[in-house]
Amino acid sequence: MNNKEIGKLGEDFTIDFLNKRGFIILERNYKVPLGEVDIIAQKGDLLIFIEVKTRRNLDFGIPAEAVDRTKQTRIKKIAELYISTKKPKFKKIRFDIMSIILSKSGKILDWEYLINAF
């Protein structure tokens, strides 16, 4: 399983997780020249930007640790661009992280959804 397949598996799991909890998926892999946001979703009056991090081991720490200040700043700038372009009408904006650990065979061993992560 390559990194792209691992990432897709994590995003698929996250979208299923969000749908089951009443989120509406607005965008998946929203790309602009500055970068990409994995998932943009809505729940009530919230617009939520979600970064999904999936790993097969903890050699480099827990997946959420990969969303460092630089990555957070980039996601916030992409969010500003999304809002200025799409002009969605939301009262609140939130940034969440889905952290997923897989077995070597690709099964989900553990996950954590971090609300308001940054």
Swiss-Prot record:
Which superkingdom? Bacteria
MF terms from GO for this chain are: nucleic acid binding
State the InterPro entries in the record. Restrct_endonuc-II-like, tRNA_endonuc-like_dom_sf, UPF0102_YraN-like
SUPFAM superfamilies for this protein: Restriction endonuclease-like
Q: Which HAMAP family match?
A: UPF0102 (MF_00048)
Q: Which family does it belong to?
A: Belongs to the UPF0102 family.
What name appears for this protein in its UniProt entry?
A: UPF0102 protein DICTH_1420
Task: Tell me which species this is from.
Answer: Dictyoglomus thermophilum (strain ATCC 35947 / DSM 3960 / H-6-12)
